[in-house]
Design a protein with these regions (language model features):
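Short beta-strand His + acidic residue motifs that chelate non-heme Fe in jelly-roll/DSBH
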Residues: 52, 71-72, 88, 94-102
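Conserved hydrophobic/aromatic beta-strand scaffold that supports enzyme active sites
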Residues: 23, 39-43, 61, 85-87, ...
Length: 116
């Protein structure tokens, strides 16, 4: 099945973060099953971030596609480069953002799956 008309959402100050989060959904919401909450490319312009938040009832896996991410994993900060993958299990906390002085947009692939 080919998906050519992808839905784009823009979330402002998501989870108390700064700026806009552009979410380019890979598949139509109607086709998402009981296991998947979201599968999308997430784009953050310089200075934009998703605020620190907890996953409850689901987990998230993120792959850095391009740019450099500032990632907070339960209070431990790290830098993600293209190809790096992080996972936030159910009940854990995280945030991710693009540095204010970044020279390019941050592109991520995000998969949020419901917990069993």
């Amino acid at each position: 099945m080919l998906f050519t008309n992808k839905k784009t959402d823009i979330a402002t100050n998501r989870f108390g973060g700064d700026g806009d989060v552009i979410i380019n959904h890979y598949i139509d919401e109607k086709l998402i099953n009981d296991s998947i909450v979201m599968y999308a490319e997430v784009v953050l312009k310089p200075g934009c971030n998703l605020g620190y938040h907890q996953h409850s009832g689901n987990s998230e896996t993120i792959v850095a596609l391009s740019g450099t991410a500032e990632y907070n994993d339960n209070g431990k900060t790290m830098t993600l480069k293209p190809g790096d993958t992080v996972h936030c299990p159910d009940g854990e906390w995280h945030s991710i953002g693009n540095a204010k002085d970044a020279t390019e947009d941050l592109h991520l692939q995000a998969l949020i799956a419901k917990s069993n």
